[in-house]
UniProtKB/Swiss-Prot annotation:
Keywords: Ribonucleoprotein, Ribosomal protein. Part of the 30S ribosomal subunit. InterPro entries: Ribosomal_uS10 (IPR001848), Ribosomal_uS10_CS (IPR018268), Ribosomal_uS10_dom (IPR027486), Ribosomal_uS10_dom_sf (IPR036838). Involved in the binding of tRNA to the ribosomes. This is Small ribosomal subunit protein uS10. Belongs to the universal ribosomal protein uS10 family. GO terms for cellular component: ribonucleoprotein complex; ribosome. Gene3D superfamilies: Ribosomal protein S10 domain. GO terms for molecular function: structural constituent of ribosome; tRNA binding. GO terms for biological process: translation.
Length: 102
């Protein structure tokens, strides 16, 4: 018999917010009696944008901005119906993107 698994993937720009959310999810899943592996830190995506500071000329004067996307992976093995209900009722911060695969 194959084991059921819920895979939760979190994305956020702030690493503190994503770590707090991951801890809430792990704590909730463990309280409901499921096995948890994670949070596993995935590679951080870094996007760099270079913009010319001046409006018309002066191409040598540029400014660079970067945007970092932090990611975490959590696997919940053998979830119970109580686990799924607890995860559905969980309130997480607005800056966290959540993908759930069954």
């Amino acid at each position: 018999m194959a084991k059921q698994k819920i895979r939760i993937r979190l994305k956020a720009y702030d690493h503190r917010v994503i770590d707090q959310s991951a801890e809430k999810i792990v704590e909730t899943a463990k309280r409901s009696g499921a096995e948890v592996s994670g949070p596993i830190p995935l590679p951080t995506e870094k996007s760099v944008y270079t913009i010319i500071r001046a409006v018309h000329k002066y191409k040598d004067s540029r400014e660079q901005f970067e945007q970092r996307t932090h990611k975490r992976l959590i696997d919940i093995v053998n979830p119970t119906p109580k686990t799924v209900d607890a995860l559905m009722g969980l309130n997480l911060p607005s800056g966290v993107d959540i993908e759930i695969k069954l």
